[in-house]
Amino acid sequence: MKKVYNLIIAVLIVALIVVVAMIVIRYGGNYLNEKEVSSSLETIEEELNKEETQQSESLPELEFKGYKIEGIIEIPKINIKYPIIDHTNEETMKVSITKFWGPQANEIGNYTVAGHNNKDGTMFGKTIYLQIGDKIKLTNLKNKTIEYEIFKIYSIDPDDVSCVESVENGTREITLITCTNGHKNRLVTKARQIL
């Protein structure tokens, strides 16, 4: 009887260790990534300022974790700021916000970005708290920052890509896409340049 009791205790301890390790790996990884994002953003912003003072004709080639970036997105209300990687795939989405579709950052058209909806609030994990009228700042590689105002928030099926279309021709728009409802839907947040 004592052997069975000891075996049950040992199994429970191992299970507890595995669960704790999984939590630490999941959230610890996000925490470390956030620290790296913060330190890299400082370097990226310094490089953008340096390029601006040098009046270079070509855009700087800046990278984050080995991936080229197109700019920086900042949403003050939910306290997020990330470099935008220039393409979307499984690997880049683990690292930062990514370009999904559209022109270069701050150009005419619908610049569409995607990011994970992390439960710890990182990446686009807090976009559910955004409302119509909230602001998004987008800085491109020319160090030009444009402020956008949210005008539409809605949910779509994962296969629906109609959100990449511009709502109004000749305007600058940004669309944020993230998963929601247990990955069954996508939360779409659309914003237009404030003129």
Model regions and ranges:
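Solvent-exposed, non-transmembrane regions of membrane-associated and secreted proteins
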Residues: 2, 6-195
